[in-house]
Amino acid sequence: MFAAVMTSLTLGGCASFSADGGMFAVQNQTGSVLNQDVVKIRSEDDAAAAQARVKTLLSKTMTADNAVQIALLNNRGLQAAYNELGISEAQMVEASLPPSPTISLAALAGTGIELERQIVSNVLALLTLRDRSEIAQDRFRAAQSRAVEATLKTAAEARRAYYRAVAAAQIVTFLEEARVSAEAVSELAKKLGETGALPKVEQAREHVFYAEVGGQLALARLKLRAEKEKLNRALGLWGDQTKYRLPASLLKLPATPKPGADIEARAVTSRADLEAARIELSALAKQYGLTHATRFIDVLNVSSLGRYERKSITDVSYSLNAGPPPTLVKTETPAKEITHRHGIDFEFQIPIYDFGEARTRLAEETYLQAVNRLIERAVNARSEAREAYTAYRASYDIARHFDKEILPLREFISQQELLAYNGMLSDLFSLLADARARITANVQAIEAKRDFWLATVDFQTAVSGGGSGGTAAPSAAMAGAGGG
């Protein structure tokens, strides 16, 4: 029995805390995807360094990469996820330690002194130490994968919020320019009406067009404020930090879209959430084996007993005194009697009513549940990768269609309508209808480009991990594009 215990202690060993708190694996896995610095803030110096870098990045015009880096340094939710990783490491180290023995001492006093000591050790915990340590190590590795997933998710949310905010700002800028033009035309119509050169109905059409553009601008400004607040939350910004500058427009479309070869295989092998699920499944398999092996014994304690007794006694002796007259002399001699006793005590549970079947069945069903969920996740990952790539390609084609076809045609139509109006070949109604259609087309073109960049983020997360935030349906940008 004791040989087995010593073997278990030797093989199990004791895990220790890593110097980086498990962050090296997180940094290594996310670095190849994000190309950004991933930092866990542990001290005031770390916090000061992170804030200094955030301040430097905020002093420049915001870019998508800078937004991601700021989020990785400044998002407290992400730091909380890294703290969860530290908790998992502490649990792993704790699971690798042998159980501490229980020591009890008892003392009785009377005619003597009686001392009793008892050392109780959980032998079952010692025998299963190595298995429990391996399970804890698997769960720590799963926690690392979850930290990778949290990092990728934070980066993806920052990119999405950035693209939405820039697109909203670009729409506001465009509508402000359109409003200035509409205001000038409205003032001109008013002056022409005062001279009688323009009928009142034509004046009203100019004025309502100006009012419509103003209403669109107000809604766009409201949306911009909302999108900037979402970006602030994603980046963890507040106070003066929110006074950053956004670029005037979204980036141009790439010359060619990314290929979609092997996206399903890449998703199944690369996604951090699937890796965490696989490691958790391994831990559950080991837990199931341990539960099955110990199903008959739930408690096994060994106690080392020792008792020390010291009693005060009196030795009595008698002697005969021969002197006349002869007398019997009684002699009392004080003495101490000391007794040492040693023993061993075994305590175990007799499985009269519970033969471990309930625990075994629970472990088995939990394991099978994890198997089915992992398979479901893998199937869903394949589908999500296909769906994300389809949306990516469709949004690219739609945004390119706006840039290459719709906007140039709208510009040509506007020029021809203006020439026809100046030559009195068309009326003001046709000119205003074309202006409305041109504004709509430009706004939709900006939204289509925004949807492409959002689809790019979704495609990346579908393959590498980080969750899905969803994008606007590509067809939404096309609605009404050909109208007018």
Predicted regions and their residues:
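Terminal intrinsically disordered/low-complexity segments used for targeting and assembly
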Residues: 1-70, 221-266, 312, 317, ...
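Alpha-helical heptad-repeat coiled-coil segments that mediate oligomerization/polymerization in large
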Residues: 199, 381, 388, 424-427
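Short, charged, amphipathic alpha-helical segments
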Residues: 82, 137, 200-209, 428-436
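Short segments within alpha-helical structural elements
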Residues: 212-239, 407-465
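Periplasmic alpha-helical coiled-coil/stalk elements that build and connect Gram-negative outer-membrane
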Residues: 15, 145-268, 391, 395, ...
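Membrane-embedded beta-strand positions in outer-membrane beta-barrel channels/transporters
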Residues: 116-118, 162, 264, 343-345, ...
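A glycine-/polar-enriched beta->alpha junction
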Residues: 73-80, 86-101, 117-135, 144-152, ...
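Small/polar, glycine/serine/threonine/aspartate-rich low-complexity segments that form flexible
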Residues: 51-60, 101-128, 132-133, 246-256, ...
